[in-house]
Amino acid sequence: MEERTVTLEIPEVLKRQLEDDCYYINRRKRLVQLPCHTNIITILESYVKHFAISAAFSANERPRHHHAMPHASMNVPYIPAEKNIDLCKEMVDGLRITFDYTLPLVLLYPYEQAQYKKVTASKVFLAIKESATNTNRSQEKLSPSLRLLNPSRPQSTESQSTSGEPATPKRRKAEPQAVQSLRRSSPHTANCDRLSKSSTSPQPKRWQQDMSTSVPKLFLHLEKKTPVHSRSSSPTLTPSQEGSPVFAGFEGRRTNEINEVLSWKLVPDNYPPGDQPPPPSYIYGAQHLLRLFVKLPEILGKMSFTEKNLKALLKHFDLFVRFLAEYHDDFFPESAYVAASEVHYSTRNPQAVNKC
């Protein structure tokens, strides 16, 4: 099959983030502290919830006849691809699988290779299930929505560099081709113009995992979208509490859909097994996930999609990168980068990674 050209626009704020990421890793020899405070599974799950609630409010604000058009002769509302929650879920699951497979191949700089080998070793990170389960149970008593609307405080975005390095705008001018160069990466180069490829390809595995790390503060912004009919200061979306006014004005079916998606998980609670090392999406965060979007056009160009399906997929990717851009300060704190000497990985003193 002939490879086709696929275009995926990256917002300017994320292009600058890619340049900064390259600068921190290759010029200042810093590494992203692992496991990330907000890992990729958490980001993807947060996006699905954000997507579902945004779509619900958008549909509720439009006149009924605009979103209840019958599909063909069936009495089923037509849902555009960009509003389809099931497609959104499939998209994030595809991102998870693709990230886990491609990270060691094309998403790491050479300086990060040693860190990757250590963090994916089975004895470096140990999953602690019991304490996390107890914590989650106590949180569930508050209802899923309260956990999302009142998350724990994310990493500080105010930490400043203590070195005398040039300011960000200057280094961005010095490295204007960061995004473009990532798209044409070649193996084992040590500068900002390339991402490395490993010499061997690991067997693809459909890893499944979960975590109890906190979500960023993005859901605090959703409180502003509570319908005017609501008089509750602490929204609760669980069906068990009858008479909750949070989604007064919504159809009962839509309220149930939102309740369902707020409790939705990307992967089962019992994965990965405790005797296996966690997959990359369990450990890495937004910094490395963003690099995947530089590579996606090339990856998609080699896959067999119909034009209709590809168009729908690209629309969902576009919405997702806009989401990353909107909550850029939450997902990309400067404090995520630390000196290599501060990154301690010891098989004698393994670090704990929470599991649900």
Swiss-Prot record:
Intracellular or extracellular location(s): Nucleus
Transmembrane segments: none
GO biological process: chromatin organization; regulation of DNA-templated transcription
Gene Ontology CC: MSL complex; NuA4 histone acetyltransferase complex; nucleus
Coiled-coil intervals: none
Ranges of compositional bias, category Low complexity: 142-156
Pfam families: MRG
Gene3D superfamilies attached to this UniProt entry: MRG domain
Keyword annotations from UniProtKB, A to Z: Chromatin regulator, Nucleus, Transcription, Transcription regulation
InterPro entries reported in the protein's UniProt record: MRG (IPR008676), MRG_C_sf (IPR038217), MRG_dom (IPR026541)
Every MRG domain range: 2-350
Compositional bias segments (type: Polar residues): 178-189, 229-243
Disordered: region residues: 135-210, 225-247
Domain of life of the source: Eukaryota
PROSITE patterns noted in UniProt: MRG
Record bears the keyword Nucleus: yes
Presence of the UniProt keyword Nucleus in the record: yes
Annotated function: Probable non-catalytic component of the MSL histone acetyltransferase complex, a multiprotein complex that mediates the majority of histone H4 acetylation at 'Lys-16' (H4K16ac), an epigenetic mark that prevents chromatin compaction.
Protein name per its UniProtKB record: MSL complex subunit 3B
Organism: Homo sapiens
Lineage: Eukaryota, Metazoa, Chordata, Craniata, Vertebrata
